[in-house]
Amino acid sequence: GWSYDDVLPYFKKAENFHGDGDEEFHGYEGPLHVKKSDRTDDLLLDKFIEAGQEAGFPYTRDFNGKQQEGVSRYEHTINDTPRGPRRWSSAQAYLHPALERENLSNEINVTVDKLIMDGKKVKGIEYINKKGERKSCFANKEVILSAGALGSPLILMRSGIGDPNDITKHGIELVHELKGVGKNMQDHYGVTSSFYATQPVTLHRSASWIKTQIAGIKYLLFGTGDAAYPPCSGGGFIKSSPEKDLPDTQLHYVLSLIHISEPTRLASI
């Protein structure tokens, strides 16, 4: 199934966790490196966490452990290498090592159009390459569709799988009626609150052309500087009211820059 207990073993199998956390919720031998932000050059990061506690929100040492509620530093998919921390994507964890296999072909700059069906069984895919040419690829055993919350239902509907009301009006032959396809998407509403810093503690310190180049060089050679860490290194999961059983609001602390095109009043910190 898809319950928490059912999927937790797979998350643990994927993870290689570095740091202090609730061990029963983490994996330590997987290919995807995960560590809590250890950034030291963001003077406002820990101040944000302190302010959250002063506002009455608890501190949690592990968002992905026993207690999600609270404020803390985020965990990132980062791997500590001899040249410092490096972003560690799922491509680096899974795809790059597998590219050496003789039975794997990887195509880039293509768009999957639809599934090739044999009755109600998927036997391959049709895709369009960067030259605009339509190509076909067939599977010996199975096809795994993993194109995201928007891409997956779009491919299914173009293949004739989904709600007939959504499919047939576009002249697509219905293969299988499944009314949930493309429905029930849940997304976050985001509200940005920006503050004017009176001291040089934001990314403005690296905003000039020469400073941007220096930041990139420091990251590539030493794994340090503003380019070495995500701008969002801390946050919180909180309840919008005490009556809530579980946190229903997420806070992000972002060390960033904004461009103001219209007169705007910003609070100073």
Residue ranges with predicted function:
Residues 127-133, 238-245:
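Short acidic, glycine-rich loop/turn motifs
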